[in-house]
Amino acid sequence: MSSHYDVQALPAEQREHILRGFGLGWWRQLGQVAIVFGVVLLACWYVGLLDATTLLNGLPSIATLAGEAMPPDFSGYRSWIRPLIDTLAMSIAGTAIAVVFSLVVAFVAARNTAPHPLVFGVARVLLNALRSVPELIMGIIFVAAVGFGALPGVLALGLHSVGMVGKFFAEAIEHVDEAPVEAARAAGATPMQVLLHAVLPQVTPQFADVAIYRWEYNFRASTVMGMVGAGGIGFELMGSLRIMQYQEVAAILLVILAMVTLVDAFSGVLRKHFK
């Protein structure tokens, strides 16, 4: 109530100035929303998303494919066990590679721990470069380099993940509380001791959360890796698609969905453990 009376007690010109500021702010926000909406609408029109005729004409084909995929054929489930294990192993190994390399790169890619601005700039460029190349393209390159199998998938997932995981790790380091860091430096700690005892304990929960999230993502991405010859359940999926065994395709997709659900549930348990 007191704040209401204080506002009313202001001079008329000052009250009018405040209200005019509120009005200008509202119109500015409305204009920004309108610009964003216009850009989104233009993008949807450009890619044909607003072409209702094309979308409606495609519905019968989608219905036909869905009909041919029913009921799912699980008769070949025994041959999917090894590819599923390969997919899970690829996601775990790729995430492990990403975490190890990101721990090294992140400390030199964070402004408050980088030893020199030049080192910081090089590290950031490296992370941006790794992040800009899709893991699918990396998978194709590594398949050509080392052959078919799970290894090219692991290398592709690991290197691409370094770009994203390293970025998140570096941002977590940049937002640490500086008080413990300054206290450690004042006590005569070496730079390595500062990192181990003042910085790392603060960012460990964030690091764990990012690593778990990336593992979830890598499991999904590892199914796509198989489509370019990098092994895993995606390879089996592409084989069924090539020979138009849509019932088997539906079964494999359901198996992938079940595995993704299990991975998500397990990652949720891990997150609670690290909090």
UniProtKB/Swiss-Prot annotation:
Subcellular location: Cell inner membrane
Gene3D superfamilies in UniProt: MetI-like
CDD domains linked: TM_PBP2
Membrane topology according to the record: Multi-pass membrane protein
Chief localization: membrane
Keyword Amino-acid biosynthesis: no
Keyword line: Cell inner membrane, Cell membrane, Membrane, Transmembrane, Transmembrane helix, Transport
PROSITE patterns, per database record: ABC_TM1 (PS50928)
Function: Probably forms part of a binding-protein-dependent phosphite transporter. Probably responsible for the translocation of the substrate across the membrane.
NCBIfam families referenced in this protein's UniProt entry, alphabetically: PhnE
Name by which UniProt lists this protein: Phosphite transport system permease protein PtxC
Organism lineage: Bacteria, Pseudomonadati, Pseudomonadota, Gammaproteobacteria, Pseudomonadales
